[in-house]
């Protein structure tokens, strides 16, 4: 699975499908569809190693499934909402094809992405939820700022806030890039359960 840590994975044949960690049905816990029944499709692999990541189990393993099987499984639940997440879904090029096919079938699709990989080719009907990495993630140097040019009012931006420094940094990005004018919603998402000894978490105020 080392290739899924690379940001330059070659495009593969759609027939190869995708490596999937899990597909499950639950209530959306964040973003604009908060509280709505949603099918989550979690893709395997991620090029980042954020200090506060709560889905490290998705870094490796998974099961390779055809696009048809993934769509059929997701369609068994009677909800129009599908969230494609990871890991980093865009680490697998066939994710782009999956997103398009889901939209063609009439689903309301959101994509949770780290923002470290190019989003310019993501299907426009998809609501991108771009997680701009804050300093405490230890991955803020991986933010691909050109992605901000491809955000619309259909999209959202998320900042994971672990401490006051993250909060101030996030406010500065809002001002620098006028992010509130680019997207429908900007989320400040607090994180508390960071692995002990990895980072210090001083009080927010």
What are the functions of these language-model segments?
Residues 5, 66-68, 175:
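Compositionally biased amphipathic helical and low-complexity segments enriched in hydrophobic
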Residues 18, 25, 37-40, 44, ...:
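Conserved Radical SAM active-site core
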């Amino acid at each position: 699975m080392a290739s899924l840590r690379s940001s330059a994975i070659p495009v593969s044949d759609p027939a190869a499908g995708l490596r999937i960690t899990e597909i499950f049905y639950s209530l959306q816990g964040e973003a604009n569809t908060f509280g709505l029944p949603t099918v989550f499709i979690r893709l395997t692999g991620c090029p980042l190693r954020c200090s506060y990541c709560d889905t490290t189990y998705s870094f490796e393993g998974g099961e390779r499934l055809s696009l048809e099987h993934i769509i059929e499984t997701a369609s068994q639940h009677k909800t129009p909402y599908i969230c494609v997440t990871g890991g980093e879904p865009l680490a697998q090029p066939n994710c782009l094809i999956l997103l398009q096919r889901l939209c063609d079938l009439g689903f309301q699709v959101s994509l949770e992405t780290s923002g470290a990989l190019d989003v310019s080719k993501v299907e426009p009907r998809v609501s991108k939820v771009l997680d701009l990495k804050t300093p405490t993630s230890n991955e803020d140097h991986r933010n691909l700022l050109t992605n901000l040019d491809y955000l619309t009012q259909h999209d959202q931006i998320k900042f994971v806030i672990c401490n006051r420094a993250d909060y101030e940094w996030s406010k500065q990005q809002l001002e620098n890039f006028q992010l509130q004018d680019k997207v429908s919603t900007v989320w400040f998402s607090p994180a508390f359960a960071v692995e002990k000894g990895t980072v210090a978490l001083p009080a927010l105020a």
